Amino acid sequence: MRDGLRSRLDPNHNHPPLAVLWSIVAGSVLVFALTAFAVRNGWTDSLDRSILLALRDASDPSDAWGPAWFEETAAELTALGGYPILVTVSALTLAVLALMRNWAAALFLAIGLSGGAALSSVLKLGFERARPDLVDHMDRTFTSSFPSAHAMVGMLFYLTLAAVAVRFVPRHSVRVFMVCAAFAIAIVIGSSRVYLGVHWPSDVLAGWSLGVGWASLCWLAAHYLSRRRGDRDALGHSRT
């Protein structure tokens, strides 16, 4: 029974087709590269500004579109992509996997999340894009703007968490729903950053693309490492 449970949590168990994963990685890198190039050359400035201003009262840029409860909801939803919640949920998930002695899934989750967070920080230092100055910020910020860490790490985290969780679910339709739900949560988080005035839309687009690409790359790495381990085990058995 325990072996069956471990197989369900193996990152390589029922993985998406490799061609699909490679296509997603390539597409994500392309979207990020094009977005970064456009940002560097100022080609996104007009659209970024138009979207930000469209979400604010024309007569008072400090007032976001919608009633007060909607503004409060956006502030609470954006916290789902903040490090306090992500680190807490990650720690609890890793603890559960450790208690199950499923080190492969735990390592997959830990490396994927920590690597994605590190990549986001490095890119922020490299681009050093200023935060939006058109509207009042409705959330505190401490780093530069491009790419959005909330969008990137949120996308990576919830997709990776869903990838681990679906190992328990036998029905394909339910697995698809869980992955789609994770994707939707990440979209809401990124959108809330623009609504709150703390990110340009192009920051969020770049973050989303990197999050999807990094999650897919982690799946590919898990597959190839698992296959190499299987080849070594098979070679060892053939020699005995």
Please give the residue ranges for each predicted region.
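Membrane-embedded catalytic cores of phosphoryl/pyrophosphoryl-handling enzymes
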Residues: 132-240
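Hydrophobic alpha-helical membrane-associated segments
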Residues: 39, 43, 115, 192-193, ...
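N-terminal transmembrane-helix/juxtamembrane module of multi-pass inner/ER membrane proteins
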Residues: 1-84, 126-127, 131-137
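Hydrophobic alpha-helical transmembrane segments
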Residues: 19-23, 36-37, 84-87, 94-100, 106-111, 176-183, 193-194, ...
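Generic alpha-helical transmembrane segments of integral inner-membrane proteins
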Residues: 26-33, 88-95, 110, 114, ...
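Structural signal for the C-terminal ends of transmembrane alpha-helices
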Residues: 2-9, 16, 95-103, 161-170, ...
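Membrane-interface loops
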Residues: 45, 49-59, 63, 88-180
